[in-house]
């Protein structure tokens, strides 16, 4: 069994935010695989299904981003899983908008949701699917990081991100089917 956790903030007011790209990707993946988020469990909205005979659980924590680890640790206990069984889908400021990268382990890189998960599950050794949202443009009236991640994608940027979310959904399927090395070689950009 694999647990795929998409990171984001709950609530309609956050749904289009850059910081919610993990939720957006998981919604796309669920739609592509006919999975609905029809349960509430472990501080999360969850759905389950199968990909190539592998049972999967999708989870969108309903804590705020900075408390995502509470949901992740409850989910691991509920399903009796190890960190090696989870995949976390996250936004990444350090990647240009629309780029994706699969990676096992590593630091939180300043991402408070990832930091919370590392703290609460006690390890950084889990797979992350990072979706680039780019850094704020320093020429753009000094936009702060918080304003950037909680801002919505604009016109051209939205088109780039829609394609990235589709590609990230495909990367999840490849990861579940062929493993991390093959998926990384195919999708890391």
From Swiss-Prot:
The record marks 9 as: Discriminates between blocked and unblocked aminoacyl-tRNA. The keyword Zinc does not apply. Keywords: Cytoplasm, Hydrolase, RNA-binding, tRNA-binding. It comes from the Bacteria. Gene3D superfamilies: Peptidyl-tRNA hydrolase. GO terms for biological process: protein quality control for misfolded or incompletely synthesized proteins; rescue of stalled ribosome. Its EC number is 3.1.1.29. One of its GO terms (cellular component) is cytoplasm. The record marks 91 as: Stabilizes the basic form of H active site to accept a proton. It is found in: Cytoplasm. It catalyses: an N-acyl-L-alpha-aminoacyl-tRNA + H2O = an N-acyl-L-amino acid + a tRNA + H(+). It is an enzyme of class 3 (hydrolase). NCBIfam families: pth (TIGR00447). Hydrolyzes ribosome-free peptidyl-tRNAs (with 1 or more amino acids incorporated), which drop off the ribosome during protein synthesis, or as a result of ribosome stalling. Catalyzes the release of premature peptidyl moieties from peptidyl-tRNA molecules trapped in stalled 50S ribosomal subunits, and thus maintains levels of free tRNAs and 50S ribosomes. Belongs to the PTH family. Monomer. This is Peptidyl-tRNA hydrolase. It comes from Dehalococcoides mccartyi (strain ATCC BAA-2266 / KCTC 15142 / 195) (Dehalococcoides ethenogenes (strain 195)). The gene is pth.
């Amino acid at each position: 069994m694999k647990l795929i956790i998409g990171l984001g903030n709950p609530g309609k007011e956050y749904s289009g935010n850059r910081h919610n790209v993990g939720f957006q990707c998981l919604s796309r993946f669920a739609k592509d695989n006919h999975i609905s988020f029809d349960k509430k469990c472990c501080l999360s909205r969850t759905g389950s299904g199968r990909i190539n005979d592998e049972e999967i659980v999708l989870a969108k924590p309903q804590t705020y981003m900075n408390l995502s680890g509470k949901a992740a640790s409850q989910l691991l206990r509920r399903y009796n899983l190890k960190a090696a069984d989870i995949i976390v889908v996250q936004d990444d400021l350090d990647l240009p908008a629309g780029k994706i990268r699969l990676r096992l382990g590593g630091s939180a890189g300043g991402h408070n949701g990832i930091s919370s998960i590392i703290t609460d599950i006690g390890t950084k050794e889990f797979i992350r699917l990072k979706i680039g949202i780019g850094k704020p443009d320093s020429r753009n009236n000094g936009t702060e990081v918080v304003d950037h991640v909680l801002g919505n994608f604009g016109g051209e940027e939205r088109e780039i991100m829609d394609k990235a979310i589709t590609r990230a959904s495909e990367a999840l399927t490849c990861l579940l089917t062929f493993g991390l090395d093959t998926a990384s070689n195919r999708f890391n950009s």
